[in-house]
């Protein structure tokens, strides 16, 4: 009788190059596209692979602004941003988020992780079911200065969850 170990299922979580992550984000039609921030040295990409094929991506970056919209206690000194989370099938986003939170986020040495989520496109369940807390709402106005696209309303999620919306 042959038995397959869970360790033999061909699944790997590891750092990947930004070009590989960007190619996947584009191929999977992520609404924000690839990670093209001015300070590329401040970006890290990780991937979930199955039998050597990339099936999910998580990109981490430093905060663009000094503080997080609606949560000024979150800043460049104490937080990193999970800037992209995408998979070739949606059910793998939860898996990638959990792997990122448990294994990748602690390597950045910051107290908090934040993620901005499009309020019109997403229900928030991916973050909520992983234990994240929604801490603020960023209302968009006009155009995104970086992309020229119409700005979008965003929910701001934080890990670890806080008791209040104010500074812990």
Indicate where each model-derived feature is located.
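Short amphipathic alpha-helix that is part of the acyltransferase structural core
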Residues: 1-40
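Acyl-donor binding region in acyl/amide transferases
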Residues: 15, 61-153
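Short secondary-structure junctions
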Residues: 30-36, 133-137, 167-168
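A short helix-loop-beta-strand connector motif used in the catalytic cores of GNAT acetyltransferases and
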Residues: 35-53
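Short hydrophobic/aromatic beta-strand or adjacent loop that forms the aromatic wall/cage
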Residues: 43, 152-156
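Conserved beta-strand in the GNAT
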Residues: 47, 52-69
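Short, well-ordered beta-strand micro-motif
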Residues: 47-49, 156-160
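Hydrophobic helices that insert into or interface with lipid environments
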Residues: 150, 162-168
């Amino acid at each position: 009788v042959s038995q397959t170990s869970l360790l033999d299922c061909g699944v790997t979580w590891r750092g990947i190059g930004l070009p590989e992550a960007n190619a996947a984000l584009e191929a999977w039609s992520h609404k924000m596209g690839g990670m093209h921030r001015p300070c590329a040295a401040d970006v890290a990409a990780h991937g979930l692979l199955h039998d050597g094929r990339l099936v999910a991506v998580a990109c981490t970056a430093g905060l663009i602004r000094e503080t997080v919209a609606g949560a000024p206690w979150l800043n460049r000194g104490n937080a990193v941003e999970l800037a992209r989370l995408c998979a070739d099938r949606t059910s793998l986003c939860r898996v990638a988020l959990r792997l990122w939170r448990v294994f990748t986020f602690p390597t950045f040495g910051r107290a908090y992780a934040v993620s901005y989520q499009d309020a019109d496109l997403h229900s928030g369940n991916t973050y909520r079911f992983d234990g994240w807390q929604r801490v603020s709402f960023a209302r968009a106005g006009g155009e995104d200065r970086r992309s020229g696209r119409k700005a979008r309303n965003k929910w701001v999620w934080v890990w670890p969850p806080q008791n209040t919306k104010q500074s812990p």
